[in-house]
A protein has these predicted regions:
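Residues lining hydrophobic/aromatic ligand-binding pockets adjacent to catalytic sites
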Residues: 1-185
Length: 185
């Protein structure tokens, strides 16, 4: 599978999307002609509803191979303030994707300030354990997380390290793949 982080970008008009669009022009439908995967970014900023997910699935009803990954809401990854109700909201949007075999996984994108220590490792395990029934992809921004303890935990629990390509600044992470995981993200 190959795709991008999101598909709804105004600056893609005229380069990827047609500069002249009819009222029926649908960006997701067009995007799906070139890619078979997308990382949903909007779920980081707002809790999506199952209705939105079902609308996307209806747009792609004939494109059976297309998959979505859902980025966890910032209350899980950046604010550390999620509630039981927030967990239920995430499960509710995953459900239609699972029913249609369209879920690639759940992405935890962690901030640069989230460095490795015992407290943060415990928190990471807590969040991961909520979603162990799904493919989990963890995107670290701080290189302190690349250690044997983490890689063993990931391998033991089939959690996937997301490879990111970003400028090396301070203690940021270099581009790397975990050769022990089945799925590369």
């Amino acid at each position: 599978y190959i795709g991008t982080a999101g598909w709804n970008y105004e600056d893609w008009i005229g380069t990827f999307y047609s500069a002249k669009q009819s009222a029926r022009y649908n960006w997701l439908s067009y995007y799906s002609k070139f890619f078979n995967f997308v990382e949903v970014n909007s779920s980081f900023y707002t809790f999506l509803t199952p209705k939105v997910i079902i609308e996307w699935l209806n747009i792609l009803i004939d494109n059976y191979e297309f998959k979505f990954s859902i980025k966890l809401h910032q209350s899980f990854t950046h604010q550390k303030s999620f509630s039981k109700e927030d967990v239920k909201k995430v499960y509710s949007i995953l459900k239609p994707l699972i029913e249609e075999n369209r879920l690639s996984g759940v992405l935890l994108q962690l901030p640069y300030s989230f460095n490795f220590n015992a407290q943060n490792f415990d928190y990471l395990r807590l969040v991961c354990e909520l979603f162990l029934d799904y493919n989990i992809f963890v995107e670290f921004r701080h290189n302190s997380w690349i250690n044997e303890k983490i890689l063993n935990y990931f391998n033991d629990n089939k959690i996937n390290l997301a490879a990111i390509d970003m400028p090396l600044i301070g203690d940021s992470l270099p581009l790397m793949l975990n050769k022990n995981q089945e799925i590369q993200y």
